[in-house]
Regions:
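C-terminal "post-core" interaction segments
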Residues: 1-222
Length: 222
C-alpha cells in the first residue's frame, strides 16, 4: 500500500466511525516525496489554497558538481536537463520553478471536521514542516511538542547534492531548491511554534513516557 492509499484508507475509517479527535504525529517526519504533504492536508480542508509563493533555484549549474553523487557525465547531464526543464530565468534575475508545475491537491468536500492535534519536534522538516505550516495557516489545530526544524515560511530541500570533500572525504548534503510558502501567520526565521511546548527529558526517555501524546490525550479527555 502506498502513502496515498494508506491516507485514503485512514480517513475512510475516520468517516465510517465518526471519529471526532485526530492526532497526527509529525515529530520524526523529515519529509519525503514532494506533494505528499499536500495530499494529506487535502483531507483536512474543504477550501482552496495556494501552497507556494515560489520555488527558487540558485543556479542552473554548480562548480562543485564533480565532487558530488552527480559527477558522472550521464547523471550530470540528466540533472542539468531537469533543472532547465522545470525552472526559468525571470527578468529579475531569479531562477523560479515554472508556474504550470505547481499542482496542489484539491480540497475535499468530505474532509475531516473534528478536533485536530499535531505533534511536532525539531526533527519535523522539509515536507513535514510544510504540512505543519499549511495546517497552522489554513486549519484549526492544536500543536504540541517542540518548534519544527523546518521554517514556517519555507525551507531549502528538494533536490539534494551529496558533496564529498576531496581531502577529508566527509560527505555533506546540499539542498539546492528554496521553497517559499504562501503563508503569513508565522514568525520570520522560526518554525511552527507549538501551542503547548513539551521539552524532551532523559527521564521521560528512559521511562518510555510519551509526554506529547499523553498531553494530547489529556486535552481530548477534558
Amino acid at each position: 500500500m502506498n502513502f496515498r492509499q494508506f491516507t485514503d484508507s485512514c480517513f475512510a475509517i475516520l468517516s465510517r466511525y465518526t471519529i471526532e479527535n485526530l492526532i497526527i504525529d509529525m515529530r520524526e517526519n523529515g519529509g519525503g516525496s514532494e506533494g505528499n504533504e499536500d495530499y494529506l492536508f487535502s483531507w483536512l480542508t474543504d477550501h482552496p489554497y495556494i501552497k507556494y509563493d515560489s520555488v527558487e533555484l540558485s543556479r542552473f549549474e554548480f562548480s562543485f558538481i564533480n565532487y558530488t553523487d552527480y559527477a558522472s557525465d550521464s547523471d550530470k547531464t540528466a540533472l542539468y536537463k531537469e533543472l532547465r526543464d522545470e525552472n526559468e530565468l525571470t527578468n529579475s534575475g531569479r531562477i523560479i520553478r515554472k508556474r504550470e508545475l505547481y499542482k496542489p491537491a484539491s480540497p475535499r468536500s468530505n474532509s475531516f471536521k473534528g478536533h485536530l492535534y499535531i505533534l511536532t519536534s525539531g526533527w519535523t522538516y522539509s515536507g513535514g514542516a510544510e504540512f505543519c505550516s499549511l495546517v497552522r495557516e489554513h486549519a484549526d489545530a492544536i500543536f504540541i511538542g517542540q518548534e519544527t526544524g523546518g521554517g514556517y515560511y519555507g525551507n531549502t530541500s528538494g533536490t539534494i547534492l551529496e558533496l564529498t570533500l576531496p581531502v577529508t572525504k566527509l560527505r555533506i548534503d546540499i539542498p539546492i531548491l528554496k521553497f517559499n510558502l504562501a503563508v503569513h501567520k508565522g514568525i520570520r526565521g522560526r518554525g511552527v511554534i507549538p501551542d503547548y511546548e513539551v521539552k524532551p527529558s532523559c527521564e521521560s526517555f528512559n521511562q518510555r513516557v510519551d509526554k506529547e501524546l499523553k498531553l494530547a490525550l489529556s486535552l481530548i479527555d477534558k
